Amino acid sequence: MRVISGTAKGRHLQAVPGDSTRPITDRVKEALFNILGADVIDTEFLDLFGGTGGVGIEALSRGAAHAVFIDKNHKAQETIKANLELTRLVERGEIVRGDAFRYLQGVPQPFHYIYVAPPQYERLWVNALTLLDEQPGWLADDGEIIVQIHPKEYEVQALENFEEIEQRKYSSTLLVFYEHRQEA
């Protein structure tokens, strides 16, 4: 695991000890940020299930203004902190120690990108997407929710406030993109 591009390019990131996370591969991370391109510059980024912090750190390295990392696992929190220090991005990263679902039940603050990559294949992505749909103020008007799951986990979601706009499959990883539903 490494930072692909930007100010921290080439830095190797620490992994969370154990098997409680499923970090994104460098190949998928590079593909994701090729899709996002320069749009990530000066944005607010939410890494909902932080894990190693690799996705939010990549966003910061490429110019995101600020990233919030949520994780309830103490080892993941320490890994994110170490990786922010390693990449010298600590001043633009914020670690929230706690449950992602409880966080989403709080007062919404808009993010341009919300990255949803739960650690296990237990429909947690559906729960997170449902909570976001109930409080659409979490996503900025021009923002995107990006879900990382195994392709076998995918199922169409009936959402009131968001619509699926794109899917990208990379071997055993599926990225699903959502945005605010357009008014008819």
Model-derived segments and spans:
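Class I S-adenosyl-L-methionine-dependent methyltransferase catalytic core
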Residues: 1-184
